Amino acid sequence: VPVVLSTVETKSFSGNLWPQIQALFPGHAPIERSSMNSWDDPNFVAAVEKAGRKKIVLAGLWTETCVALATVQMLHDGYEVFVVEDCCGDVTQLAHDNAMKRVVQAGAKPVTALSVMLEWQRDWAAKGTYPAVMDIVKAHCGAYGMGVEYAATMLHGAPPTQLPGYTIPHAGGAGGHAGGRAAAAKA
């Protein structure tokens, strides 16, 4: 999937792209722009056009400006835009919600990060991407990730997933269950 990264006035306004995002795309420099609307920037438009896709998956900070303005213009220019609602943010929840209403009324399709990832996965038999998808699900998808982890460890006997930066404490006490630790802590 082609990716276009963009930042706005990093030296005077917004700062650099978050390192957690940049780390996913090493050697992929963000397009620096001055306009809040990325679609006003000829370099951004050229990068999107070079990708040759008419379906755009868009996410970003400041839903009511950076995301909404670009979305409305892309729709006007014939693109089909999917706004990843849970990967956008704004100064208030109300501002975010109103911006999402605006882009949906203009014709954008609201999606979530999980729905995009699973649509791209499409088939659990696609083993080339399955392990990475499951790692993302377990690390970032709440109850779904917990269910996947439970099924893997309790039903299929897999070892617990070790996430970077986390350790799984040894469960001592009553048969290794948390209840044993709680009882010991009360004693």
Model-derived regions: residue spans:
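Short beta-strand segments at enzyme active-site cores
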Residues: 2-8
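Active-site-adjacent betaalpha module
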Residues: 11-187
